[in-house]
Amino acid sequence: MITVSKEDYLKAILEAESEGEAVISATLAHWLSVSAPAVSMALRRLKKDGLVRVHKDGQVRLTAAGRRIAHKLTLRHHLIERMLFEIFGMEWFKVHDEAERLEHAVSPDFESKLLARLGRGGACPHGNLSELESPVSRRRRGLLLLAHAEPGKNYLVSGIYERDRRLLEFLEDRGIRPGARLHVTGRNYDQTLTLVTGAGKVALGVSAAERIWIRTAKNNSHPTSVT
């Protein structure tokens, strides 16, 4: 039987993979805010159910069956986020936490209605696709992390990793959201970026810049900024 707890572990493994992390027990303890013994017990159950493999180096990988369940849950999460944003008008930086609470309560019938209304394609309010992408896959689409942006160039925000609500609110207050135009003006010795956004001049640390995917803007117009 697939319990809510098992679904959460499988989805966390898939999401951590999509952010380029090597998934080990400590990764899951951090992502799910649980203890190391709790992770060990959960992994034993998932392994017994044929949903994960734990390699000799400690890395945790989804089996084909585990990956199918994780993909199904991430699609449901994606649809709920889009429903909250596109239909109910909830702010983009709030929908992830709400979808986390709702995703296990959605019936197959309701999910099919969401699919019919919204479609399987399309990006969530954070700019991410329903099929979670690895960093390699994003780079193949011409994206790069804001942390690697070149000073003097203009970019568009393509997607933002969505788990950190405080970071999302911080970015929103500074005009950094999916679709926003950025002009990178400089990089300090500690890799802090200085930007101009629609909200004005912004300084952004490397840890935040590594959560934001961008693409090069097609023209050279700068954001309309507030000075």
Kindly give the residue locations of the regions a language model identified.
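Mid-protein regulatory/catalytic core that forms ligand/cofactor-binding pockets
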Residues: 103-213
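Key DNA-contact positions within bacterial/archaeal DNA-binding proteins
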Residues: 37, 93
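A short, conserved structural fragment
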Residues: 47-55
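Basic, amphipathic "hinge/linker" alpha-helix immediately C-terminal to the N-terminal HTH DNA-binding motif
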Residues: 58-77
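Short, hydrophobic-biased segments on the C-terminal half of alpha helices
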Residues: 43-44
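Short acidic, hydrophobic short linear motifs in intrinsically disordered regions
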Residues: 19-29
